[in-house]
Amino acid sequence: MGIQGGSVLFGLLLVLAVFCHSGHSLQCYNCPNPTADCKTAVNCSSDFDACLITKAGLQVYNKCWKFEHCNFNDVTTRLRENELTYYCCKKDLCNFNEQLENGGTSLSEKTVLLLVTPFLAAAWSLHP
């Protein structure tokens, strides 16, 4: 295959890559009201690149989300909840209850980590 054939092949692969990428949107469980057993799957708009599941007391939120907003401050502000556990992910239908129980991030875990880290650093620096 000469240079011209290689260019044609490269062009075809590039076109296929663009069409394959643009045709898929992330699927998430998304329920308008908090519910413990959300089974409604939606194709998220291109504005959203992550799925979110959040538990705040008895409320469970399943939503399409922006990955850049997958942090405690943004989640609590946008959902208007003060104490919660959340889990963000970037695969289709990954925001289900078991994920939250296995890998969620809660305020208490972060607080403990923030309190323990300086003490460990101080102890390490005092060690002869």
Swiss-Prot record:
Disulphide connectivity of cysteines: C28-C51, C31-C38, C44-C64, C70-C88, C89-C94
The protein's recorded glycosylation sites are N43, K66, T76, T77
Lipid addition sites, GPI-anchor amidated asparagine: N102
The consequence of F67K is: No loss of function
Could you list this entry's UniProt keywords, alphabetically sorted. Cell membrane, Disease variant, Disulfide bond, Glycation, Glycoprotein, GPI-anchor, Hereditary hemolytic anemia, Lipoprotein, Membrane, Secreted, Signal
Query: Taking every annotated instance into account, which residue ranges of this chain make up the domain UPAR/Ly6?
Result: 26-108
Any Pfam family from its record, for instance, is: CD59
Q: What is the effect of changing F72E?
A: Almost complete loss of function. Lysis
Name the InterPro entries on file: CD59, CD59_antigen_CS, LY6_UPA_recep-like, Snake_toxin-like_sf
Proregion residues excised on maturation: 103-128
> What, per the annotation, is the impact of changing D37R?
No loss of function
Signal peptide from the UniProt entry: 1-25
Changing W65E has the effect of: Complete loss of function. Lysis
Tell me where it resides: Cell membrane; Secreted
**Classification via SUPFAM superfamilies:** Snake toxin-like
Q: Which GO terms describe its molecular function?
A: complement binding
Effect of mutating E81R:
Almost complete loss of function. Lysis
| One Gene Ontology biological process | regulation of complement activation
> How is the quaternary structure described?
Interacts with T-cell surface antigen CD2.
**What clinical condition is it connected to?**
Hemolytic anemia, CD59-mediated, with or without polyneuropathy: An autosomal recessive disorder characterized by infantile onset of chronic hemolysis and a relapsing-remitting polyneuropathy, often exacerbated by infection, and manifested as hypotonia, limb muscle weakness, and hyporeflexia.
Q: What is this protein called?
A: CD59 glycoprotein
Q: Which gene encodes it?
A: CD59
